[in-house]
Amino acid sequence: MYIKQVIIQGFRSYRDQTIVDPFSSKHNVIVGRNGSGKSNFFYAIQFVLSDEFSHLRPEQRLALLHEGTGPRVISAFVEIIFDNSDNRLPIDKEEVSLRRVIGAKKDQYFLDKKMVTKNDVMNLLESAGFSRSNPYYIVKQGKINQMATAPDSQRLKLLREVAGTRVYDERKEESISLMKETEGKREKINELLKYIEERLHTLEEEKEELAQYQKWDKMRRALEYTIYNQELNETRAKLDELSAKRETSGEKSRQLRDAQQDARDKMEDIERQVRELKTKISAMKEEKEQLSAERQEQIKQRTKLELKAKDLQDELAGNSEQRKRLLKERQKLLEKIEEKQKELAETEPKFNSVKEKEERGIARLAQATQERTDLYAKQGRGSQFTSKEERDKWIKKELKSLDQAINDKKRQIAAIHKDLEDTEANKEKNLEQYNKLDQDLNEVKARVEELDRKYYEVKNKKDELQSERNYLWREENAEQQALAAKREDLEKKQQLLRAATGKAILNGIDSINKVLDHFRRKGINQHVQNGYHGIVMNNFECEPAFYTCVEVTAGNRLFYHIVDSDEVSTKILMEFNKMNLPGEVTFLPLNKLDVRDTAYPETNDAIPMISKLRYNPRFDKAFKHVFGKTLICRSMEVSTQLARAFTMDCITLEGDQVSHRGALTGGYYDTRKSRLELQKDVRKAEEELGELEAKLNENLRRNIERINNEIDQLMNQMQQIETQQRKFKASRDSILSEMKMLKEKRQQSEKTFMPKQRSLQSLEASLHAMESTRESLKAELGTDLLSQLSLEDQKRVDALNDEIRQLQQENRQLLNERIKLEGIITRVETYLNENLRKRLDQVEQELNELRETEGGTVLTATTSELEAINKRVKDTMARSEDLDNSIDKTEAGIKELQKSMERWKNMEKEHMDAINHDTKELEKMTNRQGMLLKKKEECMKKIRELGSLPQEAFEKYQTLSLKQLFRKLEQCNTELKKYSHVNKKALDQFVNFSEQKEKLIKRQEELDRGYKSIMELMNVLELRKYEAIQLTFKQVSKNFSEVFQKLVPGGKATLVMKKRRXERQSGLRMKEKGVVKGERGSGPQSSVPSVDQFTGVGIRVSFTGKQGEMREMQQLSGGQKSLVALALIFAIQKCDPAPFYLFDEIDQALDAQHRKAVSDMIMELAVHAQFITTTFRPELLESADKFYGVKFRNKVSHIDVITAEMAKDFVEDDTTHG
């Protein structure tokens, strides 16, 4: 076993968690500068293992915590991991960790992460070979110097610690304490014995007079017994007579109470009926108010529908007249349009003919004019150009321009032709689209009418269902009121039951229910929920006749909780306490109840109570535990006999009990407060309430829910229909808008057609003129340049002038005729388009908007709805009349019940008066019985006070009369007065003191034996202590000589035990704490040597090996003293070896040669034990197996594994690694 690893955090200079690399199992050396934390590392190990840090005050614990920059450390720990492969520690693990944690208010040990006590840790270390008597497996700084300069007595003390004499001294202290205590007891016993001897002598003289006194006293007690016994028998006879009378009176009282209870039951039943009827009246009145409100609402709806129907009828009538007028106007418009179109048809051919002539004349006029212009231009070019070539050049240029202009004109003409053709095509397409839209419009109108009809059908159905739902709501309200009344009745019964039960028990039941609800909400402990079965009272039934006896027998056990097992009850109680709930609970765990079969007596006068209970067989143990040992008997006499004969509890039906132990209990029991009766009423009310709720849920609420669903479906249908209606109406509006747009486009196209045609004619005329000019220029090209026209050209110009004048005159005539005809056409077309056709469109639109069919549908739906609302009004009024009749009948029933209530009240009062009278008589008998019982008790008390009597006292004076008995008693009392001075207790005192004397003598002998045993034990302890010191001295002395010779070759050293001079051993010396030997001591023990003769352990050494040069410690130098002290430490460790050693700078005062010797010694010892040392010298490094360096930076220590070379650097120049 050895230290494998050390982990430090927050301890002294080690702030951060420092995990030291695993140590070697042999020699480990730690090096570092002064103040770097080497000693703190040793302190950390000592902090866990040593007794030195066992009892720390808070300020001492705080002093061990790291103090430096940064946040303050609030706790620290040191953990040592041991290699336990040799199983030296009694733990079956190869590695064992031991951690100590401290803080300002805590100091804890953890063994393998489990908390343990300080004693556990110390015992564990001792079992591994760490001796409390030898603390030298850890040698701190200065310990060597301290030992080197210690006196001889200090070394003797050290030797005694190594020898383990502390245990002997502790045992000796205990023995001395026991001896003191024993001596005190012996002295007290001697004093008591002396007093008892004196008292016995006095009592011996008083015994003779006491004998005479006892003779007369015995006679007196016999006479008094006979007198008291006769009085007791007379009193008993009177009590029996009184009991018979009371029983007769009690039977009468029971009959009266039963009659009174019947009257009260009847009254309660009548009260219940009255409450139910009043609740029914309240419900009917509330329903009537609802019906009245509904009727008012229905009348409002009916009025609205009537007005709506009238408006629709008026509207339909007005629409019909307007439609006729519009149709008539439409017909007139069509006739006028036809007339105007006919007029237009007659005018247009004339207009077209004139226009065509005019266009030809204009074209010819333009052509002639152009030709004439060309001829005049030809004449002018003679003076314009100087040569033929110049003219030809200009003509060619003009021809080129004319060609381009002619091409442009042709393109324009072609474009207008194309535009006119497109206009015609669009006109046809527009007409087709218009006809298609007109067809679609008719289909949409039909679909809208169909949706309107369907909407009103669904709406009527929805209104019918709403009426049915209103009726069901009224029914539900009535049922709810009945339910509330039933719930109130249940709460009253539960309150009565709670009043008859203790608060603690009730709180317990409520708390258990809360625990189970908590389990159910969390979905946990299902087996606990299934394993809980409620209280005893809820798990059985019996006939009402047995309620009293059953309830008296069970008592509060009626409220015990039945569970399957103790595990279930434990789980419930754990949660019960966790939730800190109030109350008192008692469980009956079926798995723990030990119930045996009972042999019941076979008799007609009694039956087992359990046979009259009905319960689930699985709870048999629980009910046998509560009721299994009880019989129901016919009378108290039978109960008394059976209880004595069969050792069973017996009870009558009235609740009078006879315990098998002999106790009798009973009396009047108020059955009105029977908890079983109340529980039965509660259960019945709960069942009725459950039935009402089930009826409400199964019938009404289900139907209401069904109707609600149907209404929701119908509302959805109505919404869907409304959506479709909006969709189709939007489609209709869209079609109408599109038709209007198409018509406007067609009219616009017709308006632009004629201007385009005129533009085409103008372009064609212009084209002819251009082509004529081109032909003229081409003809002129190449001809001679002339200043005058040729004869032929001059003739042509004259002809053209004549033709132009004629054409201008004709064109003026044609223009006037065309303008006249065009005015007629324009006027007719304007009248057609702007007046007749526009008005026709308006008429058509008004006709479409009338929607005669749609208005009829709305009227039909409104009429149907009006019929339905009339029916509902009629039904509501009929139901209201029925309710009035029912209320009258119910109020009459309440009056009859109240009359009956008065009769039963009077009857109950009569019974009450009779009971009160009987109670007074019973009280008188009770008072007399009390007096007799008191007299009986007095007689019995006086008989008991007489004490034990001889047998003859019971028979000797039985024949004498009371007068004779009193005469004899007077004689006895006279004789007894003569002995009034006699000590009546003399004999008893004599016997008592004699017994005390014997006990004290025995106790004295026991104390003497104990005293002797303690003396013997002390002698044995003293001898063993002496032997242990002697043996330890021999071993340490031998080891010391051997070790010194190894450390100082050729040297010699011995230990010398120093004794007192002229000390003589004269037995056991008891000087500790002032104790001396007692009178009965064991005498002198000259054979037992005392360790007190030893005064110290001296050391004699010679570094040369010569006998004559042996010197004491005081004569040695400092280094020699340190070496001798080290030798002594090694010797002690050899005597009492530990698994590992920690040496802190033990070579500080040694020279190089001796340091080398110490290093060799450690190497030799490291074969069997682990060494962890610190040093500033290189010699110890040579024997080391592993090296560690400690650094101190920022006030924090760090320890790491280093190489041998680095360790030597530390030793040679520690500033390099500071």
From Swiss-Prot:
Residues modified as Phosphothreonine: T783
InterPro entries reported for this sequence? P-loop_NTPase, RecF/RecN/SMC_N, SMC, SMC3_ABC_euk, SMC_hinge, SMC_hinge_sf
Give me the ranges of the annotated region Disordered. 242-268, 1067-1089
Keyword field contains Protease: no
Coiled-coil features, chain-numbered ranges: 179-350, 393-503, 669-916, 958-989
Q: Where in the cell is it found?
A: Nucleus; Chromosome; Chromosome, Centromere
Ranges for domain SMC hinge come to: 530-642
Q: Where is the composition biased (Basic and acidic residues)?
A: 1067-1080
Under CDD domains, the record lists:
ABC_SMC3_euk (cd03272)
Location of N6-acetyllysine modifications:
K105, K106, K140, K1191
GO CC, alphabetical: chromatin; chromosome, centromeric region; meiotic cohesin complex; mitotic cohesin complex; mitotic spindle pole; nuclear matrix
The processes (GO biological process) annotated in the record are: cell division; DNA repair; meiotic cell cycle; mitotic sister chromatid cohesion; regulation of DNA replication
Residues bearing PTM Phosphoserine:
S787, S886, S1013
- Stored Pfam families: SMC_hinge, SMC_N
Where along this sequence does the record place binding of ATP?
G32, R33, N34, G35, S36, G37, K38, S39
Superkingdom field: Eukaryota
Post-translational modification summary for this protein = Phosphorylated at Ser-1082 in a SPO11-dependent manner. Acetylation at Lys-105 and Lys-106 by ESCO1 is important for genome stability and S phase sister chromatid cohesion. Regulated by DSCC1, it is required for processive DNA synthesis, coupling sister chromatid cohesion establishment during S phase to DNA replication. Deacetylation by HDAC8, regulates release of the cohesin complex from chromatin.
The protein's UniProt keywords, in alphabetical order, are: Acetylation, ATP-binding, Cell cycle, Cell division, Centromere, Chromosome, Coiled coil, DNA damage, DNA repair, Meiosis, Mitosis, Nucleotide-binding, Nucleus, Phosphoprotein, Ubl conjugation
The main location class comes to: nucleus
GO MF:
ATP binding; ATP hydrolysis activity; double-stranded DNA binding; dynein complex binding
Q: List the PANTHER family.
A: STRUCTURAL MAINTENANCE OF CHROMOSOMES PROTEIN 3
Note on domains (UniProt) = The flexible SMC hinge domain, which separates the large intramolecular coiled coil regions, allows the heterotypic interaction with the corresponding domain of SMC1A or SMC1B, forming a V-shaped heterodimer. The two heads of the heterodimer are then connected by different ends of the cleavable RAD21 protein, forming a ring structure.
What is the annotated quaternary arrangement, including any partners? Forms a heterodimer with SMC1A or SMC1B in cohesin complexes. Cohesin complexes are composed of the SMC1 (SMC1A or meiosis-specific SMC1B) and SMC3 heterodimer attached via their SMC hinge domain, RAD21 which link them, and one STAG protein (STAG1, STAG2 or STAG3), which interacts with RAD21. Also found in meiosis-specific cohesin complexes. Found in a complex with SMC1A, CDCA5 and RAD21, PDS5A/SCC-112 and PDS5B/APRIN. Interacts with MXI1, MXD3 and MXD4.
Its job: Central component of cohesin, a complex required for chromosome cohesion during the cell cycle. The cohesin complex may form a large proteinaceous ring within which sister chromatids can be trapped. At anaphase, the complex is cleaved and dissociates from chromatin, allowing sister chromatids to segregate. Cohesion is coupled to DNA replication and is involved in DNA repair. The cohesin complex also plays an important role in spindle pole assembly during mitosis and in chromosomes movement.
Q: Of which family is this protein a member? A: Belongs to the SMC family. SMC3 subfamily.
What is this protein identified as?
Answer: Structural maintenance of chromosomes protein 3
Q: Kindly list the organism's lineage.
A: Eukaryota, Metazoa, Chordata, Craniata, Vertebrata
- Please state the gene responsible for encoding this protein: SMC3
